[in-house]
Amino acid sequence: MVNAVDFNGRPFHFIGVGGIGMSALAYILAQKGFRVSGSDVRPNHITHKLESIGVSFFGKQEPANLEFFNRDSVSALTSGDKDITPQVVCSTAINASNSEYKAALKNGCPIFHRSDILAALISQYNSIAVAGTHGKTTTSSMIGYMLLQAGVDPTIIVGGEVKAWEGNARLGQSPYLVAEADESDGSLVKHSPEIGIITNIELDHPDHYDTLDQVVDIFKTFTSQCKTLVACIDCETVRDRFQPDISYSLSPDSGADYYVTNIDYRADGTAALVWEKGIALGVLNLCVLGHHNLSNALAAVAIGRQLGLEFGEIARGLATFEGARRRFEFRGEVDGITFIDDYAHHPSELSATLAAARLQARPGQRVVAIFQPHRYSRTHTFVNEFAPSFSHAD
């Protein structure tokens, strides 16, 4: 990117601001006091929230939106420039045919991918960036929640909505930032956090990657830019191809720095004894289900300890973490049928989600899966893996 993000007062305009990743950035910038506008052809509860904190929202995407800060009398009075040209932010979903995007190019607006804004924010904080094919949202939310409960007051940017901060982002006052770092379009390579986390690595996003090696290369670049790497060595690819500074695993025989024993998977949560380099720290109780969430929590334990928290503080925080929206989210119960909503769309995610559902099911109760495939390219690439991923369902 030729241009550098200007944090000296120049306004921001987001094309497609209603998306989960874009809206989080718009929210943080607005809360920091920057002038922010955004457009989206599908207004939703997220855009309504942005409007409530002062973001100027447009329900149509058209070139005139880029002139808002010139038309706005307050902006004109507070700017020393005659032409208040915004910095334009796009996601991968916005292509060259978009009318606002074309107008931004024509008018010479600085144009940034959303990952450029996130990377710029990451560089301003003691940042913890959570990467991985699966578990990014839950792990980053867990870490943010744990730090919040411990009084650290972090800034948080995640790819899901969390009840504790009523959305997908919160602005804290401490020097810490917890961010979800996305690999789907290769933009992971832009981030240089103090601490990087890898939850796992698999081939996904076949519209962007052809082979696992291509995915690994992206993660290799990312890890080379992390001052400290924390990674789960239960993943074979991570174990064989990366050298984390701090490792974690669900197996006591893995040689990991952090591991668990005495695991108790229950219908109402999970408990395990946590170990740190051969020393028992104590029992961790979670109200979220499944081995995948225990692994996510172990990443949070490793981060908490790295930041100097006592295990008791960590355990108390994680014990009340209820998860993010659409991550094994309880939606209600009718006639004895419990409805769970989950974003899982990769075979590995489906298997983990249904295994957690099986743990929660009462004796004699069936587990019925209703699945909506996400993207033709993913369904076509993993067609042989999808069938066995439903083995925990009836």
Please annotate each region the language model reported.
Residues 1-13:
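Generic start-of-chain signal for non-secretory N-termini
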Residues 35-40, 155-157, 178, 247:
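Short beta-strand "acidic-cap" motif of Rossmann-like dinucleotide-binding folds
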Residues 170-175:
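Conserved motor-coupling elements within RecA-like helicase/translocase cores
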Residues 176-184, 339-345:
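Switch II (G3) loop of P-loop NTPases
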Residues 12-14, 28, 115-161:
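Walker A (P-loop) phosphate-binding motif
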Residues 10-25, 35-42, 324-326, 348-350, ...:
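Active-site beta-alpha connecting loops in nucleotide-dependent enzymes
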